[in-house]
């Protein structure tokens, strides 16, 4: 487990608890900066550190979490689905997703949560958009994407049209769709992204387009899964999970097409706020973090 976050220990109290972030790659993440600013503002005896952890090293990292009596950890790519196998309890929403991004350690008993979905849907709601009865085109079938789909289904989306390449996630997408269809009133379909006609038809009729993939993230910042900007229309809300870079190519396309957009900072902020409360039991200093991180009003 490689620590990539430097820490000035003299500012910490004699007794503190450690919170981690386990992902690979990790250097792009704003979570350590955001969470540490929030912890400092709240005056809480915790520190948040990032560790480079991939699938191969994840089991050992979890043993380390227990041995060090860490309060918990964030979980990001590529570990979100694997992490489900290493916790003692999953929330109902996490079971529906099949992936987690948050682990809370209660004296060695690990609980798994997924705040990606609640964070992204909260960002949509905060923009004034009501998702109830709406339809969504969802790109990708990884942990973030399925979390958004599951939470959207729970909170009232009528239909989700999930598009994914026929890669290692495609069968997982089909299994996810089955779980949601069996447990919610939302209808989920899965289509190969190579079917561009189906993709175009979905965009023409749906209310929301959400990118839950890493396309648009460095080093793919010049890429977008929308090959033809004419597929986007002003009535479409386009939302993004990627926040580095802040303005992805997809968001640029959407703004050029007259769409309303929500950038990846919204999801980062709201999912992080929920994580903060799960780990500390305290309210997240939302307005302060918005200001110091430059996330806007």
Swiss-Prot record:
Q: Pathway it acts in?
A: Metabolic intermediate biosynthesis; chorismate biosynthesis; chorismate from D-erythrose 4-phosphate and phosphoenolpyruvate: step 4/7
Q: Does the keyword Amino-acid biosynthesis apply?
A: yes
Q: Which residues bind NAD(+)?
A: 141-144, 164-167, 214, 241-244, 264
Bilayer-spanning residue ranges: none
Q: Which UniProt keywords apply?
A: Amino-acid biosynthesis, Aromatic amino acid biosynthesis, NAD, NADP, Oxidoreductase
Q: Oxidoreductase as a keyword? A: yes
Catalytic activity entry: L-quinate + NAD(+) = 3-dehydroquinate + NADH + H(+); L-quinate + NADP(+) = 3-dehydroquinate + NADPH + H(+); shikimate + NADP(+) = 3-dehydroshikimate + NADPH + H(+); shikimate + NAD(+) = 3-dehydroshikimate + NADH + H(+)
Function recorded in the entry? The actual biological function of YdiB remains unclear, nor is it known whether 3-dehydroshikimate or quinate represents the natural substrate. Catalyzes the reversible NAD-dependent reduction of both 3-dehydroshikimate (DHSA) and 3-dehydroquinate to yield shikimate (SA) and quinate, respectively. It can use both NAD or NADP for catalysis, however it has higher catalytic efficiency with NAD.
Name the family the entry cites: Belongs to the shikimate dehydrogenase family.
Q: Quaternary structure per UniProt?
A: Homodimer.
Which protein are we looking at? Quinate/shikimate dehydrogenase
Organism source for this protein? Shigella dysenteriae serotype 1 (strain Sd197)
Q: Lineage, please?
A: Bacteria, Pseudomonadati, Pseudomonadota, Gammaproteobacteria, Enterobacterales
